[in-house]
Regions:
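Cleft-lining beta-strand/loop regions that shape enzyme active-site pockets
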Residues: 1-172
Length: 172
């Protein structure tokens, strides 16, 4: 029920019904492809992973499903497939990625750095908390050349990921 701010006492409230749609994670899921290129006489395979948003299936996670869908688990699987195809370099495409789950940005960063802090957060009281790479194994999932693409529509979690990769001098 709503009552406009400029209404008079005793006016009837309006009822507005909202229906929340189920978001299909498949539409936002990370996807990969390989671009083959040649420079002089040498051929190269460039793996490209497009990440439209940072997502996590909290319903599956809460129910105890260890195979829950998330940006990090999907990218880990895509990386494994790209490495089987013997890519020479990797591009993470975050253009037009408006962000999403911060925990996924920190976890995804952990696939490319050995360990360490990813971002610091300051709350309204000025208290600072640090989010580290959550992976307890100090080893990255991919060690080759890395490029992260962003544009003016990349925001929030995508900016945090891109900045961490740059701060750790892990990619450009």
């Amino acid at each position: 029920q709503i009552l406009p701010g400029d209404s008079n006492p005793g006016e009837t409230e309006s009822i507005i019904e909202l229906t929340r749609e189920q978001i299909k994670l498949e539409e936002s899921a990370a996807k990969s492809k390989i671009i083959e290129t040649q420079r002089e006489q040498e051929k190269f395979k460039i793996g490209v992973i497009d990440i439209p948003s940072f997502y996590r299936d909290y319903r599956a996670l809460k129910s105890g499903d260890e195979e829950f869908t998330s940006t990090t688990s999907d990218v880990r699987r895509l990386l494994s497939n790209l490495e089987k195809d013997e890519i020479d370099a990797l591009v993470i495409d975050l253009r037009n990625n408006g962000g999403g789950h911060l925990t996924e940005a920190t976890a995804l960063t952990g696939l490319f750095i050995d360990n360490g802090p990813v971002v610091q957060l300051r709350n309204a009281n000025g208290r600072i908390s640090r989010l580290d790479d959550p992976d307890p194994v100090p080893r990255s999932a991919y060690n080759g050349p890395l490029l992260v693409l962003v544009n003016r529509y990349s925001a929030s979690a995508s900016e945090i990921f891109a900045a961490a990769i740059q701060d750790y001098e892990r990619g450009i």
